[in-house]
Amino acid sequence: MIVSVVPINEEYVKSIECKTGERIHVYAGIKETMDVLPEAEIVIGFIKANIIEMCSSLKWLFILGAGVEMLPFALLEKKGITVTNVRGIHGPQIAELTIGMMIIFSRRLNQFMRNQGKGYVTYRVLR
């Protein structure tokens, strides 16, 4: 059984179900999942150590973020649970944002936009 403890876009759910042949049980939060978590083989979303303890069938924990440093790795290793996350999937977007911000600040476009909003007009040459 695949259980998501966080809401997921219905389009993504259908795509995953189609590719895996498994139904994904999506819940709005951890409280709603307490009855089904002991049977879950895959959990999507962050769960704490006390919840991991009660997941007797858990084989895979999929974290929808990059940060996993707060996970109880000793417990996960003892139970043989695989952990994956989404580290690195936004690399190109972050690089584009960084370049864009460098251009904005080097050319003082942020100041220009504030001045434009106030009705200021300057004819100074940008360097």
Regions found by a protein language model. Name each.
Residues 1-84:
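An N-terminal-biased, well-structured beta-alpha scaffold segment characteristic
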Residues 81, 87-127:
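Phosphate-binding beta-alpha-beta segment of Rossmann-like dinucleotide-binding domains, i.e.
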